[in-house]
């Protein structure tokens, strides 16, 4: 398996030499030493700044409230799980869920009650892998949908531990009880627009939470291989299409994108220092049954049925807004292939023994379509005319288009999406009408 090149640092530029008594124009060696010391000081400074930010949100004082009521609610739910853990009965359930057929994987899936996490957990279980879920069941969107996914997993004998990835004691306990071979890290604070009013929840989940997970993994013996959810949002303001893994990712358009970019840099650090095998997956607009209510295809369906206006964004120059919509089953295949091809971590007890695998892949459909096309397909499937409203794209972190180059994933993972948007939306609408229009549930 070929390895990707390490993520380049953005602190490589030299700094002016400190003025003093030395005549650097006459001593290239001294000039080189001064530049080296200056660069070293610069690197040390930014390292301490970054470490300080991590510690700030890791050890946030209880007397310092988050920036909004929503932040307080989210952080409370994610930091203090309502279900107790520990004890013989609990450990028995954990071991039973993680029990594996001979030769298969033993996988901890974080965010297991989420959209992608629940699908991945079911797919792993169905092929005979040992699966244990972890989820904090926060209320970013209706928790009852997460509970319904949990019930689906329980019928497949997958146990979800209710807790948070920032709970170091819980993670340590889980790794003590089960020798996981792999971790599928899908727990994160999602959503681009939500970050504008609830920034602290993104740092807590996507930065501090990722560090907490990597800390547990690097200290485990044996160390698991880690596959985690990055995002296509890291491409930010990139205008080159299609987006390739080697494209620049230093211009995020939202705080969500910035936290995912930070996650990729953190992954590089833990791979380099501790020998963790890490694979990052850049998902492109995943949709399908059991999806997230905050996604456009989901709330468009709800609003079309209710006769509400459907905003169709256009760019300031009247351009089309398009997305690389990717069906959930195709994404799950990419996730499983990433787990199956992940190299072993090379550390032991927090010490690196040799170079470890570090990869990043795009998982998209590579066929972007205008959002207006999405609405048209929903109109036909629902047999209801949408009340369309063309509006300017707000400055809220959204980007005008996404388009994945999947050639690397095709080569390394055998990844090949097969579901077009019309077929995928047909399956989603069938599920939606069955789940919400049965008279038993409200879509909000």
Write out the residue ranges for each language-model feature.
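Heptad-repeat alpha-helical coiled-coil signaling segments
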Residues: 285, 289-291, 320-323
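N-terminal Rossmann-like NAD(P)+-binding domain of SDR-like oxidoreductases, especially those catalyzing
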Residues: 2-286, 329, 339, 419, ...
